[in-house]
């Protein structure tokens, strides 16, 4: 637990520093305008976008965004639910919902605005042209190009690369811990079990990337396919989850 905790705290500090540098020394007014307008557009169009179907949206959009990310979230749900439940022990239902359902999405939208908004700003100002990179799905090239255009240049790109690497490490560690807990049947699985599942996930990802010749297309398809049976497993939580949360809230004197 201490390893995950140290990495997570370091990552939070590094993310705050990077975000502060981008906002203060970058196009501050533009980023502020983008965030306010984007949030207004998002809230105003939430239901129409959430219920969009292939009849009103291009097939490629539904495939690469709606379907893929629905499957992505479904695939992550069981492991993240187990992990969040474990680290939330001792906290109230209200505190957990506040952290997971409110604060985390707000932090995510701010981070997307800082990086994505900076990319849009430099694209519009002619600093670079990401059209070819995005059309060919070279997201790594686009990300590094945007990072090098941020305040700090190469140093900022290196910091973002480090941040991303640690995020992947903490996510993998959390997932292996969740799988080990389920497999062991208790909250304190042996370290070798966590190492085994971490290695198994890394090996599977490497195999899928190798099959896709270094591209993430095969990995994305695998996520979508495996999310189908997982969705059946988590389906009962749609009605058992609220009842469990309500029961806990009553026990904690919140309702």
Model-identified regions with their sequence ranges:
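A generic transmembrane alpha-helix motif of multi-pass inner-membrane proteins
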Residues: 31, 41, 56-57, 66-67, ...
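Hydrophobic, well-ordered secondary-structure elements that form the walls
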Residues: 92, 179, 218-222
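Short, Lys/Arg-enriched, Gly/Pro-containing loop segments at transmembrane-helix junctions
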Residues: 121-125, 245-255
């Amino acid at each position: 637990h201490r390893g995950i905790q140290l990495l997570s705290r370091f990552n939070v500090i590094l993310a705050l520093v990077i975000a502060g540098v981008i906002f203060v020394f970058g196009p501050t007014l533009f980023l502020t305008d983008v965030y306010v307008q984007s949030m207004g557009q998002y809230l105003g169009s939430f239901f129409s976008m959430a219920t969009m179907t292939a009849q009103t949206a291009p097939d490629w959009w539904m495939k690469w965004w709606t379907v893929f990310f629905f499957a992505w979230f479904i695939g992550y749900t069981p492991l993240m639910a187990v992990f969040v439940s474990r680290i939330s022990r001792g906290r109230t239902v209200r505190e957990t919902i506040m952290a997971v359902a409110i604060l985390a999405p707000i932090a995510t939208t701010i981070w997307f605005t800082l990086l994505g908004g900076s990319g849009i700003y430099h694209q519009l100002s002619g600093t670079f042209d990401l059209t070819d990179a995005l059309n060919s799905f070279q997201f790594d090239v686009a990300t590094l190009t945007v990072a090098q255009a941020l305040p700090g240049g190469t140093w900022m790109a290196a910091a973002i690369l480090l941040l991303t690497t640690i995020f992947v490490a903490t996510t993998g560690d959390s997932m292996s811990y969740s799988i080990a807990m389920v497999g062991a049947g208790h909250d304190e699985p042996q370290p070798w079990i966590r190492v085994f599942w971490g290695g198994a996930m890394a090996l599977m990802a490497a195999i899928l990337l190798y099959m896709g010749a270094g591209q993430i297309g095969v990995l994305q398809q695998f996520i979508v396919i495996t999310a189908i049976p997982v969705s059946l497993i988590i389906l009962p939580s749609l009605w058992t989850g609220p009842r469990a949360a309500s029961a806990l809230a009553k026990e904690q004197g919140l309702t």
